[in-house]
């Protein structure tokens, strides 16, 4: 009986673990610099990643452009993040604050854009990418 409880707890821990964890030593400033000037360091409540795909390539030039276009494992880390709030460096008191202490959920780099999908027929907002996938 104890084994079943331990096995269930272990499976739950694996399922709830972050897919792209951020090391404990990364500061907010370092995380922001990894995002670059075109993205904003954000803390997101929820994320949904697309499923893994397997593509069988046939022929001489098969799959030549697939990695350039974002197919397969090249799209790793891209997800649908929701409930994101920006982590602004200028508002933080200590610039050396540890990132994992400021955000306990999903840490991501979200594109800086004024775009919004609200009230638009074909509205789209740019996605976020998990910070742990680019470290």
Curated annotation (Swiss-Prot):
Keyword Secreted: yes
Disulfide partners: 35-109, 43-103, 44-84, 110-128
Signal peptide: 1-17
Keywords, sorted A to Z: Conidiation, Disulfide bond, Secreted, Signal, Sporulation
Transmembrane annotation, as ranges: none
Record's subcellular location: Secreted; Spore wall
Pfam families in the record: Hydrophobin
Function recorded in the entry: Aerial growth, conidiation, and dispersal of filamentous fungi in the environment rely upon a capability of their secreting small amphipathic proteins called hydrophobins (HPBs) with low sequence identity. Class I can self-assemble into an outermost layer of rodlet bundles on aerial cell surfaces, conferring cellular hydrophobicity that supports fungal growth, development and dispersal; whereas Class II form highly ordered films at water-air interfaces through intermolecular interactions but contribute nothing to the rodlet structure.
Subunit architecture: Self-assembles to form functional amyloid fibrils called rodlets. Self-assembly into fibrillar rodlets occurs spontaneously at hydrophobic:hydrophilic interfaces and the rodlets further associate laterally to form amphipathic monolayers.
Stated family: Belongs to the fungal hydrophobin family.
Protein name: Class I hydrophobin dewB
Organism per entry: Emericella nidulans (strain FGSC A4 / ATCC 38163 / CBS 112.46 / NRRL 194 / M139)
GN (gene name): dewB
């Amino acid at each position: 009986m104890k084994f079943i409880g331990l096995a269930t707890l272990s499976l739950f821990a694996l399922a709830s673990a972050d897919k792209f964890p951020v090391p404990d030593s990364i500061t907010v400033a370092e995380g922001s610099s990894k995002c670059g000037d075109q993205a904003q360091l954000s803390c997101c409540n929820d994320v949904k990643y697309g499923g893994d795909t397997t593509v069988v390539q046939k022929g001489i030039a098969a799959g030549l452009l697939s990695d350039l276009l974002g197919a397969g494992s090249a799209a790793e880390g891209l997800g649908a993040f929701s409930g994101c709030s920006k982590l602004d460096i200028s508002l933080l008191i200590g610039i050396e604050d540890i990132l994992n202490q400021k955000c306990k959920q999903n840490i991501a780099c979200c594109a800086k854009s004024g775009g919004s999908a609200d009230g638009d027929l074909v509205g789209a907002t740019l996605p976020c990418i998990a910070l742990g996938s680019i470290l």
